[in-house]
Amino acid sequence: GSYLGNMALAGSMFDLRLYDRETHLQHQNNQEDGPNIWIINSYTRTKQDFSNDQIHGNANLYKLRMGTDLYNEVSNKGEQQLFGIMAAYGNGSQTTSARFANRDSKGSVDGFLLGVYGSWFENAHDRSGWYADTWFQYGWFDNEVNGAGLSKESYDTNGWGLSAEIGKSINYKETDRRTYSWQPKLQLTYTKLNNDTYTENNGSTIAFGNEANLQTRLGLRWLSEQNTASTKKDSFFAEVNWLHNSNNYTISSLGDSISQDGNKNLGELRLGYEKEFNKDWFISADLSGRFGSNSYSSFQGMLSLEYLF
């Protein structure tokens, strides 16, 4: 089960959305300024079963991601285009236990990713209207598995991911102090892990399957943003999403095959807050939870910082 858990941890390291790295507030000071640096810290705790509830798993994942815009320009029509580079480090650990046998195992993954991203906004001034975002990432992963009473197994893997996201911000109410908006959005993320068949120290072989996955995310975000002349604005948001994964990771060994359970279709709720400390510093924080079938659950806390030079 730990080999399968390591696949899930590696695949999760690619997760990234536009508004993970772009705050709603910073555009008011940085429509075409630069450069900037953004940093994202996140911690995720996941509970998941494998092979029709025969194996129980718990996983923890820490990710540190940072990047900078290399190009940021606003056209005469008020449209904004930006392009940047990013890097990420992830450290994950997980434990699995067999339901009807006294067998536990542990796994861990260290990952390093490099990537590029690009975004387009219809209205640079307040980010109303349409937007589009895309990114590409490539990652390298060091994996370990420790079975009870067995020697440690170590192996290397790699993978890549490609994403396209589109959405529209619709302002529906404006007061003297705040602007309220809805933002429907759609994101497609394709990831491909490359795991060679691995031979354990005892001679058993581990074959990895369903390494490619297309995740569809359809969601709606509600936003309340301060619109006064203050240089210390803030915003609140709530977001609901439906996520669909085309494949569940699988592994095969000694004629037996096991796969992920419960994450084919997921519901997600996110709540967040963004704050402008001054014209250069911005911070955002959010909490989210995902829920699926077969007792699948995942909870994440995220903290993002952005500095404008």
Residue ranges and their predicted role:
Residues 1-174, 286-300:
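Outer membrane beta-barrel translocator domains of Type V secretion systems
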Residues 11-18, 42, 57-64, 92, ...:
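Short linear motifs at secondary-structure transitions and domain/linker junctions
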Residues 45, 95, 99, 143, ...:
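Residue-level signal for well-ordered alpha-helical segments
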Residues 112-115, 205-309:
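Outer membrane beta-barrel transmembrane domains
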Residues 152-252:
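Detector for outer-membrane/organellar transmembrane beta-barrel domains
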